[in-house]
A protein has these predicted regions:
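Active-site proximal loops enriched in glycine and acidic residues that flank catalytic Cys/His/Asp
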Residues: 62, 74, 138-141, 187-188, ...
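Short linear capping/connector segments at secondary-structure termini
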Residues: 125-132, 164-168, 361-367
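Glycine-rich loop-to-alpha-helix module at the N-terminal edge of alpha/beta enzyme cores
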Residues: 54-55, 59-61, 66-160, 445, ...
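Conserved C-terminal structural/oligomerization subdomain of aldehyde/semialdehyde dehydrogenase
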Residues: 1-9, 14, 18, 64-72, ...
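Residue-level signal for inorganic ion chemistry
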Residues: 67, 88, 103, 206, ...
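Rossmann-like NAD(P) dinucleotide-binding subdomain of oxidoreductase/dehydrogenase enzymes
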Residues: 127, 146, 156-310, 503, ...
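ALDH superfamily catalytic-core signature
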Residues: 227-232, 254-256, 260, 267-417, ...
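Hydrophobic face of amphipathic alpha-helices that form TPR/SEL1-like repeat modules
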Residues: 1-69
Length: 541
């Protein structure tokens, strides 16, 4: 910064619009939805600011209407990925030297573009691409992405302001340099906000990026790129390639200039990428930063003192919103025997009241799961539960992929606390419940801690403070985001930094300064004012 210590706007969370019947935002988003749904878009690669078409394309279809085509996207060859890397490294020469206030200005502008002129489009695109109902689209594609962009600017300046002590003899300064080389963002299908944030936060800190979105999110990724372009992200700073993830990752990770991976997705893929980075370690110019937020097997534990209606609501919302396709979605619950009959009745009532169908019909709470692979996997586990003697489906259990990938919200009750669906991440609208002896709370907490390899989110519901304290201690390492008397989903940027440990990731807390710190390499500068001219110290006489 040259000529001032600039204050950035104080970050505030974007208010969530209601989309209630009769509201102007409801009409506007539906109009945009219809226009997008009934037209076709062509999505190019983005390399050095150019829209690159390769002739090798794949079609895009909404999960709730999979025979309907809303466009095509172009697939990269290895040479495109290599070009994107070369381009990024060239762009780095100017981008990494640009004063921070200009980087801040670009991403603050992106936030306001989404809050205003692009809001309907990014929400409608997310409803189409990922089959989100309007509320789920609004809290993700609009609000969370806006929040990431605004708060990251504030976090960046907080980091820059973190400086060492100086003395009268020497002035100590830390410069938060971007990483040397280029970075790689690999993003999941389920959150448009995560897709935008992973490349944007690295670019904000002065890095250049190759971004590989999920095949199932390309349609809404295009809107993110439209916004970044209009906001003024210069050519070559964020380059986007679609296509074979293995080829793209092999090409990226083979480059000696690869300097950081920002990944969100499944645990297996992340571990494979980590392994590959390890295998290539002798080839890199620097030690690459590795940040990954991955799977979860998120829990709800109710204590015998809990309110049954509150427990049931935490299950209905926590497990089934966005068809359970949130990394934080509750997928196993432990209910004490004294509450079970009431919780069961309320949950069944709730689930039976859910309407399922296209997000265009705004009375639908449940829409489709993301793709056929996910549908088939969920159907297999549901069939398994129907056949297994230690499992019982108490509501749901049907599925139909004739028009869209629709899985009925399903509640499995098991007598075996280690039943397969108590341990495995299914990533769909299925929760498994284990009813425990109300007097075996301590043993149950131990069980919760030991049942899964993951440690992302979890919730305790209780009216008893001692029981809450007991759970907080016993489950200290079982969740990176722990909720007391709430559902385990719905983290808000700037309020609940998000991430888990164990197999759930590196826990670098998206939506916090901690995450941004991973994308800089500090340089310590000591400036001595009166430089010594004699090597002898006084003790030498
Ligand atoms: P996924 O692992 O299938 O895909 C994630 C990304 O990795 C995509 O871009 C995909 O194309 C890419 N990929 C897939 N195979 C690859 C390979 N062999 N090499 C390189 N890249 C590859 O995950 P998904 O289905 O998109 O998302 C769901 C998963 O993401 C769940 O496990 C969920 O828990 C997790 N998730 C975690 C968080 C979190 O914050 N912890 C947030 C969202 C999603």
């Amino acid at each position: 910064m040259g000529k001032g210590f600039f204050n950035v706007p104080i970050a505030v969370n974007e208010p969530v619009k209601s989309y209630a019947p009769g509201s102007p935002e409801r009409d506007a988003v539906l109009k945009t939805y219809k226009a997008l749904f009934n037209s076709q878009v062509e999505v190019p690669l983005y390399i050095n600011g150019n829209h690159v078409t390769t002739g090798n394309t794949r079609t895009m279809s909404p999960p709730h209407d999979h025979k309907h085509v809303v466009g095509t996207y172009h697939l990269a060859k290895q040479s495109h990925v290599e070009e994107a890397i070369a381009t990024a490294l060239e762009a780095r020469k100017t981008w990494s030297q640009l004063p921070w206030e200009h980087r801040a200005g670009i991403f603050l502008k992106a936030a306001e573009l989404i809050a205003g002129p692009y809001r309907d489009k990014i929400n409608a695109a997310t409803m189409i691409a990922q089959s989100k109902n309007i509320h789920q689209a609004e809290i993700d594609a609009a609000c969370e992405l806006i929040d990431f962009l605004r708060f990251n600017v504030q976090f960046m300046t907080d980091i820059y302001a973190e400086q060492p002590e100086s003395t009268t003899e020497a002035w100590n300064r830390i410069e938060y340099r971007p990483l040397e080389g280029f970075t790689y963002a690999v993003t999941p299908f389920n959150f448009t906000a995560i897709a935008g944030n992973l490349p944007a936060c690295m670019a904000l800190m002065g890095n250049v990026v190759i971004w590989k979105p999920s095949d199932s999110q390309v349609y809404s990724a295009k809107v993110i790129m439209d916004v970044f372009e209009e906001a003024g992200v210069p050519p070559g700073v964020i380059n986007v390639v679609f296509g074979d993830p293995v080829m793209i990752s092999n090409t990226v990770l083979a480059s000696p200039d690869f300097s950081g991976l920002h990944f969100t997705g499944s645990t297996y893929v992340f571990k494979e990428l980590w392994k590959q980075i390890g295998n290539n370690i002798h080839n890199y110019k620097t030690y690459p930063r590795i940040v990954g937020e991955t799977g979860g097997k998120d829990f709800i534990v109710a204590h015998r003192s809990a309110n049954a209606k509150q427990v049931a609501t935490a299950i209905s919302r926590g497990a089934f919103e966005f068809q359970g396709q949130k990394c934080s979605a509750a997928s196993r619950a432990y209910i004490p025997s004294n509450l079970w009959e009431d919780v069961k009745r309320y949950v069944i009532e709730d689930v039976k009241s859910f309407k399922m169908g296209s997000p265009e019909d705004m009375s639908n709470f449940i829409t489709a799961v993301i793709h056929e692979g996910s549908f088939d996997k969920l159907a297999k586990y549901i069939d398994g539960a129907k056949a297994d003697s230690d499992a019982e489906i108490i509501v749901g259990g049907n599925y139909d992929k004739s028009k869209g990938y629709f899985i009925e919200p399903t509640v499995i009750v098991t007598s075996n606390p280690k039943y397969t669906t108590m341990c495995t991440e299914l990533f769909g609208p299925v929760i498994t419940i284990y009813v425990y002896d109300e007097h075996k709370y301590v043993e149950t907490l131990k069980l919760v801690d030991e049942t899964s390899e993951y440690a992302l989110t979890g919730a305790i519901l209780s009216a008893d403070r001692y029981a809450i304290d007991e759970a907080t201690k016993a489950l200290q390492n079982s969740a990176g985001n722990f909720y007391i008397n709430d559902k385990p989903t719905g983290a808000v940027v700037g309020q609940q930094p998000f991430g888990g440990a164990r197999a759930s990731g590196t826990n670098d807390k998206a939506g916090s300064a901690q995450n941004l710190l991973r994308w800089v390499s500090p340089r310590m500068i000591k400036e001595t004012f009166v430089t010594p001219v004699d090597y002898r110290y006084p003790f030498l006489g």
